[in-house]
Every structure is written in C-alpha cells, then in structure tokens.
Amino acid sequence: MNRRWVLALFAMIVVLSGCSSSSVGSGAGGSSDEHSGQDGKTIEIATMAVTPYLDEAVKRYKKIRPDIQIDIKEYLARPQTEEGTSSEAFSKSDVEKYVQTVSTQMMSGKGADIIVMNDLPQDKYVAKNMLTNFYDLMDQDSDFDRNQYYQNIFENSQDGDGLYAMPFSFVIDALTGNTELLEQANIEIDDKTWTWDGFKEISKKLKEQVGEDYVAFVNLFPIQMLAQYIEANYDKLIDQGQANFDSDLFRDMMKQIKSMYDEGVLKAEFSYDYSKTLFNKANLFDPMSGLSQVLDPKLKLYQNPTVNGKYNGTPFKSYFTLGINSKSKVQDEAWNFIKFMLSEDMQSSPVVQGFAMHKGVVEKQLNDAKQQAVAGTLPLLEQKFDAETVESKIQELHQLIDGASRNLSSDQKVVSIAIEEFDSYMSGQKSVEDVSKLIQNRVNTYINE
C-alpha cells in the first residue's frame, strides 16, 4: 500500500460528520479574556467544524440568554464558504490544523473558553492542568442532578479521578453475525471470552461452509483494523504518559492483523458486494436503530473479540465532547451553556447523534420505538413483534448501556504514527520487532514534546 492510500484511508478513520451552519468566525485567534458585549459576556468555542447539535444549541441558547454572546471559531485546513461551513468530510489536514492551532493556544495560556475535544491530545491537556474538572462544577451547582445521566459513561470518560471532556451522547460498539450461517456451521460463540485469533478460526470455518469469496468483514482495511485495536487497548498502550508499543501486546496485535489478511479472512480491497460478509460492525447508534438490530431474527449481536480473551465491559464511543479551558474567565457562563446542552429539552433534539446522556430521553425514545415495533412500523424491520418480546430486547439494550465501561478514545497523533509505520510490516519490508520499536520511539518523542 503506497503512502497516498495510507493517507486516504487515515482520512476515512477521522471522518465523523459533515457540518452545518452557525455564527462562526475564521478561527483567527483564541480568547480567554472576559469579553463584554452591550449587555453581557462572550463565550468563545473552538471547533474543527460546526456540528448540527452545537449549531442548534447556540441558536436556542441565544434566545433564552440574549445577554450572552457565543462566538464559534472554526479551524479547517481548506477554505471555508461564505457562511463559514462545509459539507465535506474532515481530512487529515483539517485534523492536523485543528490540533496544532488549539494546542499552541492552550500551551500559551490562551485559547477558547470551550473546546471541542475530539481528536485533541486530551491526556496532555489534563497533565498540564489546561482543562477544568466537570465534577467540580457539578458539585458546586445545586441545580444539576448528575443522577439523571448515565454515570457509567461519565466515569469511563474520566482522566484519573476527573471528568475533563463532557460527553453529550454515545454509541455502543459491537458486531453482528448471520444467525443462519452460524447455525448451519454449528458454531456457538461466547463473546465474553473470544479472541481475535478465535474470530479468525470461526471465520475460516464459515468460509468453508459458504465459499472462499466470503470475508469476515467487507471493506475493512489493515490500517482501520489497527486503529480499532489501538482504540480498544489505548489504556494499555499509553499508560500514565508512557508508551508501551515495544511490547508483546502490540506485536501480537500486528501479527493477528497480518495473519487475517494473509490467510484470506480479510481482504485489503474495496467491494460493493456486502452480501459476501460473514460479520458486520454493528454500532448501536441510537435507541431506534439499536432496538431494530437486537430484534432482527437474522442477526445475532456480539461483543467485539479482544486480544487476550478478557472481557472488560461493553465498548462505547462519544463522537462529540467539550472541555472548558481552565484559564477561561467566563467559566460559569461556559458551564451554564454546557448544562443547557445536557438539558432534557436539548438532549431530545433529533440532531443528537447516538444515545443521549440523559436517561429520561433514552427511556422515552425506547418506549416510542417499542410502540413502533409492536405496530410493525419500526424502520428496517417490516414485521410486528409482540410486546413481551420487544420488552425483553429492550432489557438487553439496557444491559449493554449499563455495562458500557470501555471508552474507545485515543490520541489521533499516536494512531497516525502507528499507521505510518505499520505499512512497512504489512508489506514485509520490516519485521514486527523493528516496527514496534520505531513506533515506540516516535510516540515517546511526541509524548515528551
């Protein structure tokens, strides 16, 4: 795989969403000063690009707090449109510009009051006391009831004992298997103990049953697989500011990935034929699609395999998190805005991507989905289900949500370094030992910058 493909595929990994319109600036500079408008103060928000949820929150907040000015600074490598927005996917250059610009501002003691934390080196910011601990703000605010929210998501989004990046929604990460194919091959899966090596052997057995033109996952490339491995094991690969890539753990990861492509379980080529997949990535994006997936009789939902067969809880991911600059002079105003974004009213917005953090909102959405399932109008499933079956599946979803305890979060710069060096191992140019040492040295250099 040449460098152009490496960069192109990395861009696929960092793509999260397009953007929508809002009152955005050019990203010309940061702000930690207390700005005074005609009637109040100004909150500055730094983001790579405006998300629909942030856009709607700003517009609605201005109606109830006209005394607060909110300025959004977008940082994109490509030119912006007249309205400061773009419908294009984020590129690697966009991510690099955002990380570099915001990090430079934060290191100098400046920067925006609120920062979109996704893709930023959060652990570095926390180590240098650049972010405010949300738990402190919650404890000081008698109007905020944290019990209305999923505590396990808060707790597993922490750095140490503090919460420095506020999640507003989350997605459950899992995979699905074809029920009929698995039954025909007489395969039973214990997803609490299975490993990627076990997954490979199961896939090979299924291929013998249905044909060699099948693959475990369609359109899953080696660097995507590597990025997923790193995310799932990030706390072991970066432990208390120390890199652990020159280790048997990481070398075994690389060997597992290479063996799956060498043995034909996966193919590093694009295909439009998704009927030739044995398994599917099954991210549960929201209550309605989640219920559809667990109700589908053709599919069986599984936890992802692990490197060592040790189940550590359901993995989840938050695609939109916010931090508050510890140097901000409008921290109270920033917290009030974020608290508004966590309100039941805002969390009920259709632009929320994922399961809302507000438990009451999720309960209502699950109840609505249940009624649709019983009536036979649930999207993707053109059949009716009895209320008892639907309720049992809703309880399965609750178990997944309540068991979510592994935050799939990583420093994209670390992932980028690993991807750049990994290709030389996949192509046979370098040994797994040499590549792990190269990655270790480069990551350590980056960490110590």
What are these regions (language model features)?
Residues V15-G18:
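C-terminal motif of bacterial Sec signal peptides marking the signal peptidase cleavage site
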Residues A375-I447:
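C-terminal capping/gating helix-and-loop segments adjacent to ligand/active sites or protein-protein/ligand interfaces
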Residues E56, M225, R251-N336:
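Extracytoplasmic/periplasmic substrate-binding proteins
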Residues T176-N178, K317-V330, S349-Q353, M357:
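A bilobed periplasmic-binding-protein/Venus flytrap-type ligand-binding module shared by bacterial periplasmic
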Residues S36-V50, A57, I68-Y75, D113-I114, ...:
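Short, well-ordered beta-strand elements
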